[in-house]
Every structure is written in structure tokens, then in C-alpha cells.
């Protein structure tokens, strides 16, 4: 076990000098453990990660927790290995920090639990699955217009309070119930309150037993926020590679991962790049994103909440993320204001999987016709607002008539919201979704009142609601 000494502390960055020419490898974890000798000192149990070799037997490291109380001359021990975290069944239903230590007050992880290093190479080219397979979510608007790919990366855009968390919970619920799949949630640099709320909501909705949670929140040093996404990814990779599972990995928020890297970049002595970001931005993002993929054994599908600074989509942080995405789900406040939940914008959400060779010709044609109808309705709204419906041609009246039914039919009740709404949630298979929208486009339900289409699952539920109202079907 090699020992060194702290020679410089610059906020979250610590320089350590080793004796006898021994230098720990890049990414090795170093430990500083110090017992307070008087009331002016504090107990220190700190993990550092080696980032640079400076020469002269000195390394520059990033601290995974606060460096308060650290002084020059303190002893540092090289663990001889990278940070490693527990993986497997022991992680389910638990909450961890970046080092894989439980923070939910539910007891320690067994000492014999398997631990894997957080830095690992991406799967080799020959290990990747070549088939593109759709991940059925049971959420109509997603499955029809912006389908998710197994092993794909999905960007989730949305402001505060439009339903990102509820959508995430429903996806976790549906993957657990319908696919028996595991979910891993990585809270990266977001509010502690939101993490706490999410944990308790998951407990209440019963999906926590199929979920592992990892947090490195806003109040933590940049080292923790930089590495916590890798901790979550390592836990997800075990379920994919060792158990052949289809795993959902949620990262909230991927922008904070980049932000944390930029905070320490200048302190590490790197020359800033565009807008002050780290010069290694694309490399760091690539190392994370390339590990999220489908292999012959299983898949890791990632849903990443993306904050766009000052709504500037050309900012290097979101722009670098976009190049990795397979699909986007855009949540919009104006959709939520119409009482349509999930508040997904059907025209702004996209997916590279919406192609006839992947989803099939019928699904593709129905989805495109739905988008055309909604786009035409959007164009007509100004005319309707000024002149009213009577001034429209018969053809345009029919477009508006069907578009409103489509809009409402894109909504549905969620299982995880059942305790608030009192309405049972619905999981709609893709085939049923496509059939329902096809029949609406064909005019089969033009005679039914449009409010009957709101917050239902399959198209049969619309017919039943209309019958209950006394409408002749």
C-alpha cells in the first residue's frame, strides 16, 4: 500500500506527492482518513480520483466530497484500483451516493456483495446487437410518434412542472410490470428535494423494488456530480451483461454532468474551450454515451433529462448531447394547459425509429397522417381565433374535427398517478395504438363527442364512455 502526502488544495482539486517514484494510475481512488485531534479539527474520510500526472512524483486529483478541513502534509493512501460500487440484486430498492455507499438509512450493503469499477470500456463492436428493436412503453403518444429503441438514448426536454417526473415514473412502472425490467435512476446535480420526493413517490407507487437510485446532488462538489452518472451506468451494465435484462437508465440532468466537468477543468490546468467549457467535453460525453447500448445479451436504454441553458440549443453542452440521441420527447406547458397528459408535444418530438423498415409501413403511415392532421390544425388556429369555425371550408372543418379527437386521444391515465386522479392507469400495446388512430383518421368515430376521447387507453374505452352518455354508437 503506497502512501503520499497532500501538497496543495485548490477547492475540489488536490495535489498529492508520492515517495519512492511510485505513482498511482489515472482514475485510481486515493483515500484520506484523518481523526480530529482537537475541537478545531474535523474527522475526514475523503476519496480522491487521480486525474493527471504532473511529474516530480506528483498527481493531481479530484475530490469526491468536500475538502473542508484538509491541510498540507496529510497522509494519502493509494487503494490501487478505481472507485468501485456494489452491483446486482442488493442495489434494488436502495439509494446510493457516488461511491456506492447507501444513503437511505436502510442499513449497510453486505460486505461480500460484488463491486465493479465505474470506469470501464464500452462494449466491443462485435458484441453490439445489430437489429433495431422497438421498446414498447405502453404510452400512446410515445409509441406512435416518437418510439424508443432498445439500447437507444432519448432526450427528455421540459420546463418545471410539466410532468417529467411523472413520465419517468410511468416508464419505470411499465418496464417493471410489462417487461419485468430493471430501472436505474441517476440524479446528477439536481435538487435534493426533488430526489427525496421521487424516492417517496416511487415507494408509494410500488416501483422502488425494481429500481436502484444514485444521487450526486446540487450541493455536492463537482467531483461527485461528474462521476455519479458513471456509478448509475455501472449498476445498469451489470443487469444488462450478467442477467441479460433490458435496463432503463434515467439521468437527470445530463447537462449537470458537463457543468461539473467544466467547474474542475480550469483547476486541473486545462485551457478552456468554447463558452468556457472543458476542451475534453466531446470525449467525456462520448465515453459515457458509448457505454449505453444494446448488446447480444441485453440492452441499456437511457432517458436523459436535458436542461438547455438560456434556451440556447447551440450551446456546446446540449449540442454535444444531441449528436448522441436516437429520439426526443418534448414536454410543453401549452399542452399541459389544455389538460392533455402526458403533455408531450406531438409535432416537436422525434425519433429515428419512425421509419417504415423499423416500425412497419402501416404504423409509419398512420403516424405521418396524425402529424399532418395536427400540423394543419395548428395552421388553422389563427383563422379560427379571428373568423371562427364557420369561415372554414368543409375539408378544413373535418381536419379540425378529427385533429381535436386525435389531440385528446393522445392523452391517457397513468398507473403512478392513480392515487391522485382516482382513475386506473392504462398500458396500450403498439398494435392497439396504431389501430385506434387509424380508425379515427378514417372517420369511424366522427359522430362521438370529442370530450369522450380524453384520458382513455384503447379506442374501445371511448365507445364505452359514449354509450354511458347515451350516445348511439
From Swiss-Prot:
The gene is atpD. It holds the Pfam family ATP-synt_VA_C. It catalyses: ATP + H2O + 4 H(+)(in) = ADP + phosphate + 5 H(+)(out). F-type ATPases have 2 components, CF(1) - the catalytic core - and CF(0) - the membrane proton channel. CF(1) has five subunits: alpha(3), beta(3), gamma(1), delta(1), epsilon(1). CF(0) has three main subunits: a(1), b(2) and c(9-12). The alpha and beta chains form an alternating ring which encloses part of the gamma chain. CF(1) is attached to CF(0) by a central stalk formed by the gamma and epsilon chains, while a peripheral stalk is formed by the delta and b chains. ATP binds at residues 158-165. Its EC number is 7.1.2.2. Produces ATP from ADP in the presence of a proton gradient across the membrane. The catalytic sites are hosted primarily by the beta subunits. It is a peripheral membrane protein. It comes from the Bacteria. This is ATP synthase subunit beta. The lineage of its organism: Bacteria, Bacillati, Bacillota, Bacilli, Bacillales. Belongs to the ATPase alpha/beta chains family. It is found in: Cell membrane. InterPro entries: AAA+_ATPase, ATP-synt_VA_C, ATP_synth_F1_bsu, ATPase_a/bsu_AS, ATPase_alpha/beta_chains, ATPase_F1/V1/A1_a/bsu_N, ATPase_F1/V1/A1_a/bsu_N_sf, ATPase_F1/V1/A1_a/bsu_nucl-bd. Keywords: ATP synthesis, ATP-binding, Cell membrane, CF(1), Hydrogen ion transport, Ion transport, Membrane, Nucleotide-binding, Translocase, Transport. Its main location: membrane. The keyword ATP-binding applies. GO terms for cellular component: plasma membrane; proton-transporting ATP synthase complex. The keyword Heme does not apply. GO terms for molecular function: ATP binding; ATP hydrolysis activity; proton-transporting ATP synthase activity, rotational mechanism.
Amino acid at each position: 500500500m503506497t502512501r503520499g502526502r497532500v501538497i496543495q488544495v485548490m477547492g475540489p482539486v488536490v495535489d498529492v506527492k508520492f515517495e519512492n517514484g511510485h505513482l498511482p494510475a489515472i482514475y485510481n481512488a486515493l483515500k484520506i482518513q484523518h481523526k480530529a485531534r482537537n475541537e478545531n479539527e474535523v474527522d475526514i474520510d475523503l476519496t480522491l480520483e487521480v486525474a493527471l500526472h504532473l511529474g516530480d512524483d506528483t498527481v493531481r486529483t479530484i475530490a469526491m466530497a468536500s475538502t473542508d478541513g484538509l491541510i498540507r502534509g496529510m497522509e494519502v493512501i493509494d487503494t490501487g484500483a478505481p472507485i468501485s460500487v456494489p452491483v446486482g440484486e442488493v442495489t434494488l430498492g436502495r439509494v446510493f451516493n457516488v461511491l456506492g455507499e447507501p444513503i437511505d438509512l436502510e442499513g449497510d450493503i453486505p460486505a461480500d456483495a460484488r463491486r465493479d469499477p465505474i470506469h470501464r470500456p464500452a462494449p466491443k463492436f462485435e458484441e453490439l446487437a445489430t437489429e433495431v428493436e422497438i421498446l414498447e412503453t405502453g404510452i400512446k403518444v410515445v409509441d406512435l410518434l416518437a418510439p424508443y429503441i432498445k439500447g437507444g438514448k432519448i432526450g427528455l426536454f421540459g420546463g418545471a412542472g410539466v410532468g417529467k417526473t411523472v413520465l419517468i415514473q410511468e416508464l419505470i412502472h411499465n418496464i417493471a410490470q410489462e417487461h419485468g425490467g430493471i430501472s436505474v435512476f441517476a440524479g446528477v446535480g439536481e435538487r435534493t428535494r426533488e430526489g427525496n420526493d421521487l424516492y417517496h413517490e416511487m415507494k408509494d407507487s410500488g416501483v422502488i423494488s425494481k429500481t436502484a437510485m444514485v444521487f450526486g446532488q446540487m450541493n455536492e462538489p463537482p467531483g461527485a456530480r461528474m462521476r455519479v452518472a458513471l456509478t448509475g451506468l455501472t449498476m445498469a451494465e451489470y443487469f444488462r451483461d450478467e442477467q441479460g435484462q433490458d435496463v432503463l437508465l434515467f439521468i437527470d440532468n445530463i447537462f449537470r454532468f458537463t457543468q461539473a466537468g467544466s467547474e474542475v477543468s480550469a483547476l486541473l490546468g486545462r485551457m478552456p474551450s468554447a463558452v468556457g467549457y472543458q476542451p475534453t467535453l466531446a470525449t467525456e460525453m462520448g465515453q459515457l454515451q458509448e457505454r449505453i447500448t444494446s448488446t447480444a445479451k441485453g440492452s441499456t436504454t437511457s432517458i436523459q433529462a436535458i436542461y438547455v441553458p438560456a434556451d440556447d440549443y447551440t450551446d456546446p453542452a446540449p449540442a454535444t448531447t444531441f449528436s448522441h440521441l436516437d429520439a426526443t420527447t418534448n414536454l410543453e406547458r401549452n399542452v399541459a394547459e389544455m389538460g392533455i397528459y402526458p403533455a408531450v408535444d406531438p409535432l416537436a418530438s422525434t425519433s429515428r425509429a419512425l421509419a417504415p423498415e423499423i416500425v412497419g409501413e402501416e404504423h409509419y403511415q398512420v403516424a405521418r397522417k396524425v402529424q399532418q392532421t395536427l400540423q394543419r390544425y395548428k395552421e388553422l388556429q389563427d383563422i379560427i381565433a379571428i373568423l371562427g369555425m364557420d369561415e372554414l371550408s368543409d375539408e378544413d372543418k373535418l381536419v379540425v374535427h378529427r385533429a381535436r379527437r386525435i389531440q385528446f386521444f393522445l392523452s391517457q391515465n397513468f398507473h403512478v398517478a392513480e392515487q391522485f386522479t382516482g382513475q386506473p392507469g392504462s398500458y396500450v400495446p403498439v398494435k392497439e395504438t396504431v389501430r385506434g388512430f387509424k380508425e379515427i383518421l378514417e372517420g369511424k368515430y366522427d359522430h362521438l363527442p370529442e370530450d369522450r376521447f380524453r384520458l382513455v387507453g384503447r379506442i374501445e374505452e371511448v365507445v364505452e364512455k359514449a354509450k354511458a352518455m347515451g350516445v348511439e354508437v
